[in-house]
Amino acid sequence: QAGVQPRDIVAVALPRSPRMVMSLHAIQRAGAAYLPLDIEQPAARIQRILTAAQPRTVVVDETTRTLLEGADVASVDVSALFTLPHPGGSATDAAPDAADLPSAIPLPTVQPTDPAYVIYTSGSTGEPKGVVVSHRAIVNRLLWMKEHYGFGPQHRFLQKTPYTFDVSVWELFLPMLCGAPLVVAEPDLHRDPQALAALIRREGVDVVHFVPSMLAAFLDEPASEGLRMNAVFCSGEALPAPLRDRFHARMQSALHNLYGPTEAAVDVSFWDAGRTDRSDPIPIGFPVWNTGLYILDDCLRPVPPGVTGTLYLGGRQLADGYLGRPDLTEARFILHPGFGAEDSPRRLYDSGDLARWRRDGAVEYRGRLDHQVKLRGQRIELGEIEAAFSTHPQCRQVAVIARVDDQGGQRLVAYVVPQSDAEPQPVVINDEALAESLLDHARTLLPAAMVPSAVVLMAALPINASGKMDRKALPAPVFAVQARTPARTPQEKQVAAAFADILGLPEQPGVEDDFFMLGGHSLLATRLAARLRDQSGVELTLGAVFEHPEVGRLAAWIERLQRREADAT
């Protein structure tokens, strides 16, 4: 009815729900490719993606239809199509009368080379880029996983990864290939380890995915201890050996390490990080079906075991390229002449990752060549963040880096040289109003995960002997607390102490200080919620930290919960 044809692109702007799952399957059945939109990202970024992708239509519901206000694109509102007692729909939704629907809608024949989905990732040029993946590519990945791990109707899968990340593809479609149940987590539940552990126990989930940093937070949650599952998969970041060992000490499950970029249908290699594995570092392992891993030097020649080179990927799972960007596709997807006299040219993807062969034939990840980083599982091009800051009228020059904080986590920090005709200033400039203005500007253009935790204003960016910017010489940010009103009540002091400890602050914050403005992020928020839950004895949720991020407000909320529990007894 919306005129969708095979090979069309249909954008989707829905919260995670059964309604979202069915919408994606409906798009596939219509022969189109789905393009997931992050409904929490700024409207300006959504508009840029829609302008670049030119979808046939956008699927929305009553909670997201306002996102398209002012956009020149058709939409399909599925609010009335599903009757679901779930956040994606309610029991009072008015479902259409079956008599009003066509009795038999002819379904198109989908070719293996047709696009299955388009996922936008961060772009180094300042614009996100859409990766086009075919049915041929993703079906290879799904069938490999089904057969390699022996999944079938007896397993229960959890869909918790946001659908704008490619891990969600196997969570959404592999259960259907296996005839297995799919448990759909409520929106934002993937951020809350306590709620996640409860859901896994309640629903009997036995196949689940974690980004390693989130797995660490999950293992910190007391409710996770002793969980029994068939398989836990990790990807998106390097899996540290100590985390593997800690996992096996707390949980009864197989642990698998997967690796792959969005440009190669989710994952291209695997490693069994089981109880007997003693690898350190843990390798990314061996290739999946019909896939080649190639470690090449600067002249595109294979390197011997133990020598670090650039990892190139080949085979059936390679993406078609970047939507509407033939220049970028040609730069990253190369045609290699082959590795022998009788070899024919082959198409390879330049991953930008450094790697080396182990003696046993497994591949070991060694870092990145460029300024791309993985932050809590999300691939981020620092160039896109720098481009956003550059559009602020007071920004003359900017550099963004990911710094390791005192707790071992990564935080994005922006270093900005402001426009100024004034006399020479100190190396680091103190202008809180300008720093906050720059951050506010970035929030209108970037997803929350890409907004830096801090802005450092500098008179000039450091230069090394060769005349290039010296990123290693950029100073560490100081997350200054406001402390206009110091914590006074016992509960305020407890919350302030937890803020200071978890964020590594040099002094205790005041009651107006905001956890996230002081450098906090979602994973640190899970630690804060767990700490205060243990100390206060109340069921403090992760959502409460996001709703009451200031010391005083969070302390007042905890006191309210304590009074409520006291009244109940």
Q: Where would I find each of the regions flagged by the language model?
A:
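AMP-dependent adenylate-forming
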Residues: 42-43, 57-108, 138, 253-257, ...
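Short acidic/glycine-enriched loop/turn segments that link adjacent beta-strands
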Residues: 166, 263, 406-410, 548
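Phosphopantetheine-attachment site and its flanking helix in carrier
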Residues: 17-28, 380-384, 396, 469, ...
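Phosphate-binding active sites in nucleotide-utilizing proteins
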Residues: 6, 33, 519
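Motif- and composition-driven signal specific to adenylation
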Residues: 19-25, 32-51, 55, 61, ...
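Active-site/ligand-binding surface loops and adjacent short beta/alpha elements
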Residues: 14
